[in-house]
Amino acid sequence: MVPVYLAAMPGSPAPDAAGPPALAVVGAAVFDGGGGPPLPGRTVVAAGGVIERVGPVGRTVPPAGAVVVDGAGATLLPGFVDAHVHLDCYPPAQVLAGGVTTVRDLGWPAERLAALGARAAAPGAASPRLLAAGQIVTVPGGYPTRAPWAPPGTARPVDGPAEAAAAVAELAEAGAAVIKVALDDRVGPTLPAPVLAAIVEAAVERGLGVTAHVGTAAEAAKALAVGVGELAHWPFDPRPLPDPLVDALAEAVVAVPTLHIDPSPARRAGVRRFVARGGRVVYGTDLGNQGPPPAVDTEELRLLVEAGLPPAQALAAATSLAAAHLGLAGTGRVVAGARADLLLVDGDPLADLAALSRVRLVTRDGWVAANSGRQGGATPPVP
């Protein structure tokens, strides 16, 4: 019996009459996740776990009985989407309370992910929404079979194309949202190109993408050649990647840079070149590794801005763009009809990323996960 850690990809949001009570955030500036400037003086109303209305304070009245939260002096954003975590390294409730409402786990034992997934799927769960890759596909003796951070069962060694395709089928049956492969020639053998190609083919047959942990430029080129569509990190190669490779990566892959865990000059410059060539970037932190906090990682965002993303685009990479990349319809926006995944912070994060650490309110599907106490109480019924 294969442990199932994600029963199904969450579909488009729909109001749940038995869900959380109506909620209204009044008077906040709203960054809606689309990459534009915040809209000042807005009221956002959510009911049944879905955003119902977003409008100017004077023309948007909270419904009777709604819990009203004071948004004065604050910015309301979509809850963050972290595309690279190892969730079991921290209490999920702590991650959620820090403003991260959706995560994608990129490598952990199936049995432990099954327990995390069951908790995350419960209504009102004190956990981010969880998508997962499951085990990391590698070769015998390859990364991360001997990595000190990886519990037994994190790696899925395969020997040959047939065994690789069977591993993909098993991971897909368990509910994998993506297939992760390890190509780290700095620490051991790596998947040969024919085996890697078999993994990509088997994943595509099941509607899944492939993300790669790559150590060097050579492994990035190998991944690119067989159709891997995502880098789970920017390569750790201390040498600059050749220009033709950066050009090709910018054309063909999405990068989850994870710069905070290793902000070496070569990696920072590489992401800067990738962005300058129009490469697509999605926010991910490698939570569980050294550096990233169990919350919004403002240092990762700062490094993305340093790499050339305007602040609004960096925030979009952590909200709407990340959600779209993960296939989550109706997530990562503060607009009518979207999931009520909300993050209210003191100040303006576009002017000062540190504002993202000053959390006033977090909701996931409309359920309150963190509240600093600036609450106006329930709106009285209209006579």
Predicted regions and their residues:
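His/Asp/Glu-enriched, well-ordered alpha-helical/loop segment
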Residues: 267-348
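Divalent-metal coordination cores built from histidine and acidic residues
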Residues: 74-76, 92-184, 188-208, 244-245, ...
